Amino acid sequence: MVNFVHPEEMYLFVESIRPFEVREVGSPKWLEVHEMILGLSQQAALELSQNREEEVKEFLISRDKLRVLIHEAYCVTLWKTRVLPHLLEIDPNPQATFLIYTVLYHEAALVALLDVCLYHPSGCETLQESVLDLIDYCAQAISQVIGLVSMGYHENETKLDVDEAVLTELERQKRDFIYKIGLRCISVLNYIADNVTLFHLSAARRLLVTHDIPWLMADVLSFRPWQRKTSKGIQKFIDEKWTNVDDVTKIVKPEAQAWFCVRQLLLNPQIMENYAFNEARCKQLHKLLGLMHEPLLDQLPPLIELKVFLSRLTLSGNTAKTQPLLLEDIPQIQEELLKDVEENGGFYQIAQDQDSVFLSKNKENICALATRLSKAYGTDLLCELEQNMDDLKMGEAKDAGAGGDGDTDHTCATCQAKAKKKCACCKKVHYCSRDCQLKDWPQHKLVCLKT
């Protein structure tokens, strides 16, 4: 059985996860933990895709590591927004950017793990007061996605120029991760809304008053960041990549999660009794009625009840209520991180201290780090899993009577030997091993990135 993390390694990996400060990002110890988080994230996704026992989720929850994951997500957010700009001021065109990319990827892996764990109420229960920090984080991430969509980001098919400046490429990578993380956060907020009664009243207030999540989700559903129109037709964001769809009305996961989040909040009398349905909110929520067409309700029947509620709300008009005085908890994680930054000279000082790490020009160090990270990302294993999935789909198609010409022998693009693995990006070029793939990458990337 293929695994990214073997059962005997699981306990060690989970126990090794610890909170880092912003100044520690990119350090050897940070990279070591990054490799473990990456492996756990890949293993968790594998367990879900194959309907296996969710061991990663169980270990993270039982060892109370979800707060650490939230802490680390905030840590990377502060680094990429407050430290990275200073690093690029020092050197606008760094010689190697893969370590910066690694930090950006780290945040996506953390959010993916939170998404897996919080699907279960037991995961939500372990959050305790850190749920406030997570709500703030998710609301900010979703708002950033709305900002990108409003600027037409998702309508632009990425055609990367090979001669593109490094700074522009980094900005593109940052936006790609903002997009993926933001859509994941829709799912996370839905799980929190579904289990909001497990938390202190401060969590409900954070959702409804501080961030007005029903309003935010109405914006998300109006902008539809999971759908775009391209020269190839309508595409939807499925499994973290854009895919052509024949049926435009078919609901994808982020869309369903956004609808359910609105439903869980608006139809929960325990938390909505103090939500002021003023004129502005009624007008905003009324937009949802125009989106609730028959194909949507056929696929998501629980939304029928929400449609009835919104229709009555439109007829009843303004029902604003006085907000009661409520003492609430204050999010702590970001404040703790900022306090450590101040005690260590501020963000610019951290950037100067990390100059030798992220802006290194030592070719030996760069090559050694590249080798280490390439192993962490498990190119061979990823290709093997993708090939297994492709073979499975091909077999299902044959069983269904689709026919075919049988297995096709592919040759390695580097050494011309028989090859079963293929590039994980374009899925068009085959290789017999990771070594051959790495040798061919300088030439293949010109075609692969354009594809």
From Swiss-Prot:
Annotated binding of Zn(2+) 1, by residue? C412, C415, C432, C436
Where does the secretion signal sit in this chain?
Answer: none
Against Gene3D superfamilies, the record matches this protein to: 6.10.140.2220
**Could you tell me the keywords of this UniProt record?**
Cell projection, Cilium, Cytoplasm, Metal-binding, Zinc, Zinc-finger
- What GO molecular-function term can you cite, just one? zinc ion binding
User: What do we know about what induces or represses this protein's expression?
Assistant: Expression is dependent on the transcription factors that regulate motile cilia such as Rfx and Fd3F.
What is reported when this gene is inactivated?
Answer: Sensory defects and loss of the axonemal dynein arms. Flies display defective proprioception as a result of malfunctioning Ch neurons caused by inner and outer dynein arms (IDA and ODA, respectively) defects. Males sterility due to immotile sperm.
Q: Which residue stretches are annotated zinc finger (MYND-type)?
A: 412-448
SUPFAM superfamilies, sorted? HIT/MYND zinc finger-like
Biological process (GO) annotations held by this record are: axoneme assembly; flagellated sperm motility; inner dynein arm assembly; motile cilium assembly; outer dynein arm assembly; proprioception; sensory perception of sound
- State where the protein is found: Cytoplasm; Cell projection, Cilium; Dynein axonemal particle
Q: What is this protein called?
A: Zinc finger MYND domain-containing protein 10 homolog
